[in-house]
Every structure is written in C-alpha cells, then in structure tokens.
Amino acid sequence: MPIEINKVYCCDSKIGMQELINQGIKVDLIITDPPYDMPCMKPGGKSRIADRLRKEMNELEEAKLHLGISNDYLELMVKLQDKINIYIFCNGKQIEQYLDFFVKKHKCKYDILIWNKTNAMPCYSNKYLTDKEYVLYFRKGGLCNPRCYEDAKTVYQSSLNAIDKKRYGHPTIKPLPFIIKMVKNSSMEGDLILDPFAGSGTTLVASKRLDRNFIGFEIEQKYVDICNQRLQEKEGLLEISN
C-alpha cells in the first residue's frame, strides 16, 4: 500500500505506520487522540443525565474508543520521527503509561496541556467532575516555539464540542482552535504531520489550514468519509484511499 501525503487512509494505524517506516517516510509532528483506557460503566436510572451517559458510552463502545492502546503503537510513532515531537490526548488513567514510555524509556521532555470543559456533564456522585482532558506533549529535539503569551498557555477553555459532534457524528471530536495552536507551536509550513487515529479529521483540517502536509489513518470507513468531507469543505477534493 504505497502511501502519499495529504491523503486519509482507511486502515489500522499499526499497519499504516509500519508501511510509512517501510517506505522510509519520516514525519515532523504527530498529533493524535487514540482510544482512552476506560471501564464500560453505564449508570442505571431513568434521568436525562443517565440516558445521556448510556448513549455516550454506547457510542464509545461501538467505535472501540474505550480500550486504550498498547506500547507497540507508541514504538511505531517514535520510529517515524528523527526528533520525537508528539501530542497525545489521554485520560488520567493513561498518564502513567505514557510517562513511563516516553520519559523513562525514551528520555523525553514533556508538558501537560489541559482542555478544560466549561459545560461538563453534572455527574459528581462520589467523584469529581469529568471536566478536563489531558494532552501530553513529548519532545526530544522536537519543536516547541509559541509565538505569544496566549499560544504558550497550557490550559484551553471551551465548551464541549456539541455542534461539531452532531454535525460530524464523532463521539470524541476535539476543538479545532486547540489543535491549531499545537500545529502552530510545534511545526513549520511544509512540515509533514501524522494523525494515526484521525477520527473526524480535526488534526488534518488544522494542518491543511496552516499550510502543513498531512497523513491520516482511520480504521472506520465512516470516519474516513467524514475526514474527507471536512477537508473538501475547507480545501477542495481529496480522495479516499483504502
């Protein structure tokens, strides 16, 4: 499967990344939102909140976005870069895994960015609100060059992405302005950016908007179609590659 830039491929990211390695293709930046490691706990009851939680958990299960990823995927990400330069979304349970791999094993520097959700679901029975998601930024020779104070902030505040989630049909869509900041801070025009878990294509749209090249891998065909729909809206036609 020869891989070309500025295309989205419907395949398992492990297969896609190995093919990039086989072809000798290196990437300058990886921004990705892999599956979170989370238990399949569904609330009982008949309240609107319970119904909404069950619906969201069902969506995550259907898309297999609750199983986490193994270090095999992380090893491939490292092999694809001359300098480690990776943003990876995660939940609190995964932080230890990623720090062990990137910091202990590969001696990376790291920063923790936070997406603070201003309208998180009001569920706090025997727990704190689930009102944030983490982005771990690992680098070893990678570029971190915020242009201004605002770009250097580590906390991004916004509401849940309800409009885009409904429009594009992906359960874990991320805010485009947040991704744009990462692309601006850690790459240059013409660089090649990879998202091995492309989802609805937010990283790819941000890359194209900022004159970066991109490659995306996504295992679900329906989300590959959404990626291409979004890219067509912004930048013209792109083909789907299987």
Please give the residue ranges for each predicted region.
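Core catalytic lobe of class I
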Residues: 1-225
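Short, conserved SAM-binding/catalytic segment
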Residues: 1-4, 228-242
